[in-house]
Structure formats: structure tokens, C-alpha cells
A protein has these predicted regions:
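Nucleotide donor/acceptor-binding cores
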Residues: 3-5, 111, 234
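Acceptor-binding helix/loop patch of EC 2.4 sugar-transfer enzymes
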Residues: 12, 77-87, 133-170, 213-215, ...
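Structural motif
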Residues: 111-112, 181
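Helix C-cap/helix->beta junction micro-motif
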Residues: 38, 129-135, 178
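A conserved catalytic-core segment of Leloir-type glycosyltransferases
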Residues: 44-105, 208
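An aromatic- and histidine-rich active-site surface loop
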Residues: 18, 88-98, 112-133, 139-148
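Donor nucleotide-sugar binding/catalytic pocket of nucleotide-sugar-dependent glycosyltransferases
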Residues: 136, 146, 161-234
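N-terminal subdomain of nucleotide-sugar transferases
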Residues: 1-65, 181-183, 213
């Protein structure tokens, strides 16, 4: 019988299984479903603030026992109104600060972890905590932050921008160096992370495209779909 593992997932900007309404499964839900289906226990760390809806899921910290094998932990943060702006930076700073407080109280360590990047701050906090305890983790690169912010500036201002964002560069490189492996949705993202952190590629670094679950359709549904496309001239 395979060993039953405890896996942590840290993904703060994606829909959660506990969210109301329909939502497209992304990294967090897909991985959690795969792990729990295999009989493992999963703790999914996320934010109390819903990035897509721009509303809070709860006030303060909350733990949700979503199923027998899946616990969802919501980390408090102030939230923000716009995807780009100081409000989001402040939210991520507070999110990381609160995550650090919660980790200090943690008594049960995971066997392994999967960490979404960005946010840089919380990813750096989590990888550092895991590294100190020799717990393997995979850092999932979803964005080329903070490099793309500097690259978007006129050439004459890029050195100034890099200096202003230097704390983010430090935390990002630390997270990428302290993780056991890197993953990304595309080869270009993985190459950027390896180059950014001066990290030699190993067998632990891999590209994992975002996919959706296979869905079963009936013969009637298939026939109806074919007829619809034929009407469109396809």
C-alpha cells in the first residue's frame, strides 16, 4: 500500500473549491483533486481575499474542512481594488506577514509542498520555512515578476526601477534558490526563472502546462454539437 502523505499547496490568487458559483479549475484545484483522489491529505493555503471577485471570503483567519482529505486555510489580508497598484503590493506584504505568524504556530509538518509564485513575499516565506526543515517543495512560476516591471520601463529608468524593487528581487531569488524544484506552465517561464536565479537546471525543474479535466459527453450531446458546427459551416 502506498504511503499516505500530507501535502501543502500555497496558491493565493486562484479560485477555491469552497468558492460560490462556477469557476474554472486551475493549479490549486486540479492538484488538490489529484492528490486527494490518490488518497493523500492536502492543506490548501490561500488568501481570505478573492482575487477574481475582489471580495473577502471571510473576516480574519479561517480553516475549512472541505472534505475528509482536504483542508482549506484562508490567510487574512486587507485586499485591493485594482490588479496593478500600491494597494495590491500592500495586501501581499500583509498576507506574507500573517502567513509567517501562522507558520510559527504550526505543529504538523507536511511531507512536501507546492507553492505558487507570485506573490513573491508569501512564496519566499513558505520556501524559507520549508528549507529550514528539509521539507521538499516545488515553486510554481506563474509570472515573471519583478523582472517584467523593470523591462516595461524606458531604458534610462530601468536601473532606478531595479533599485526601487531590489527587495522583491532579493526575495524572489531567495525563493527560487531555496526551493527543491521549479515548475512553470511554459518553457519560457521556466528558462526565465533558472536564468533569473542563476540556478542550474536539474531533474526537479519541469514544465507542466495548465490543463482541464477530461469530461464525458453523451452520444446525444456529441450529435448536437456536430449539428451546431455544421450549421456554422465548419
Amino acid at each position: 500500500m502506498n504511503q499516505k502523505l500530507l501535502i501543502w499547496i500555497l496558491q493565493t490568487g486562484e479560485p477555491l473549491p469552497s468558492d460560490d458559483g462556477l469557476h474554472r479549475p486551475m493549479r490549486a484545484i486540479n492538484l488538490a483533486n489529484a492528490l486527494t483522489s490518490a488518497g493523500h491529505n492536502v492543506v490548501l493555503w490561500s488568501a481570505s481575499f478573492n482575487h477574481q471577485m475582489k471580495v473577502h471570503r471571510c473576516n480574519g483567519y479561517k480553516s475549512i474542512q472541505y472534505s475528509e482529505n482536504l483542508e482549506i486555510r484562508l490567510i487574512p489580508s486587507p485586499g485591493y481594488k485594482k490588479n496593478i497598484g500600491l494597494g495590491r503590493l500592500f495586501d501581499h506584504m500583509i498576507l506574507a506577514k500573517n502567513l509567517k505568524k501562522l507558520l510559527k504556530q504550526e505543529k504538523v509538518e507536511p511531507n512536501a509542498a507546492f507553492i505558487g509564485y507570485p506573490p513573491i513575499e508569501s512564496a519566499s516565506i513558505m520556501t524559507h520555512w520549508l528549507k529550514k526543515r528539509n521539507i521538499p517543495c516545488l515553486l510554481d512560476i506563474k509570472d515573471q515578476w519583478p523582472s517584467f516591471m523593470v523591462d516595461a520601463l524606458p531604458r534610462g529608468f530601468q536601473s532606478i526601477g531595479r533599485a526601487i524593487l531590489s527587495p522583491y528581487f532579493y526575495l524572489a531569488k531567495r525563493a527560487m534558490k531555496e526551493t527543491t524544484g521549479l515548475s512553470a506552465m511554459a518553457d519560457d517561464f521556466l528558462k526565465w526563472a533558472l536564468d533569473f536565479s542563476n540556478r542550474e537546471r536539474t531533474n526537479n525543474d519541469l514544465t507542466v502546462p495548465l490543463t482541464t479535466e477530461n469530461c464525458q459527453i453523451s452520444d446525444d450531446e456529441r450529435k448536437s454539437a456536430i449539428q451546431w458546427w455544421e450549421k456554422q459551416g465548419v
